[in-house]
């Protein structure tokens, strides 16, 4: 059977449901697909189908994630939902499922709970830029004042983590009632059923409030060097996958990391032994570089648009440390611990100087399974930017994953 061609007629965005356990994230995901399926803009997915999320690996870590896709009138969405809390933590830190925005699900009957807070904090630290709130289980709250109180509490909580709590759209509804309405024969048309309308209203807010992300190809050029070789009579070629942006023959680029930054001109772009005029984000290419010796460039450096990225050694990061059962360490570690930090294509040794818990207090040690903020100092400068992901390794095995939250020097 021929594979269906992916028609890219609408702008694309990646979103996901976040929030406390049992507040209705998966039911909402099922309700969105079921309601939109009525308009032919999604494939209806049942709760059980989403809940049985397949395992996947990201940066050496196993995570359970369900991926669904659907469309609204304006956009195409890829939506992720995780069955367990630990899966959210791992997913957001590894960036396995990048989110341009999130739907925070809060039970109107319970209000914000510990994981509500933790997911908002995580969203802030890993750089999920926009949040829309769905107050679920509205059918279980008889008192309109109570609903207003919960809304106020959610807005204050979001503001306390530097999200614009006063401006964030909050839609109240019931995912279960909407699902049951469609199963009971509701059309999915606006105005036919009040519970279905609330799901449609939520998607209108998501469409309007979460901005369309800049396409990778429109961002500044960056390619991590994977391999380097010499072509006799032509010069030095660096190969790798273009992470973002584009590169054309004749353009000036910088070689960043491990040594002093230097400029060079791209004299050729090749892919699969064919020459191209330009390489785009996602392409695996070889770039021929003018005036560069094979010894001047090595794996772990990046090629980038001049001035777009700089080398650093010291940064703050949010890290998830693998449990023993996940293949991680069996024992805790302390400040001064020196593992390898695997960034893009290479391992760099770094020392961990201090740990900070969520409440801002200093932690004395880190136990496998913890999520912690830590300050890292690498022995060699490499191209680092806020929001960049890395793995922490020890003797070649992954013991943790992290994301850069702040560059220090």
Curated annotation (Swiss-Prot):
Methyltransferase among keywords: no
Region (G1): 19-26
Main location: cytoplasm
Reactions it catalyzes: GTP + H2O = GDP + phosphate + H(+)
Pfam assignment, any one: GTP_EFTU_D2
Gene3D superfamilies: P-loop containing nucleotide triphosphate hydrolases, Translation factors
Domain tr-type G, chain residue ranges per copy: 10-214
Keyword match Coiled coil: no
Binding partners and assembly: Monomer.
UniProt-listed NCBIfam families: EF-Tu, PRK00049.1, PRK12735.1, PRK12736.1, small_GTP
Functional description taken from the UniProt entry: GTP hydrolase that promotes the GTP-dependent binding of aminoacyl-tRNA to the A-site of ribosomes during protein biosynthesis.
This protein's name: Elongation factor Tu
Organism per entry: Synechococcus elongatus (strain ATCC 33912 / PCC 7942 / FACHB-805) (Anacystis nidulans R2)
Top-level taxonomy: Bacteria, Bacillati, Cyanobacteriota, Cyanophyceae, Synechococcales
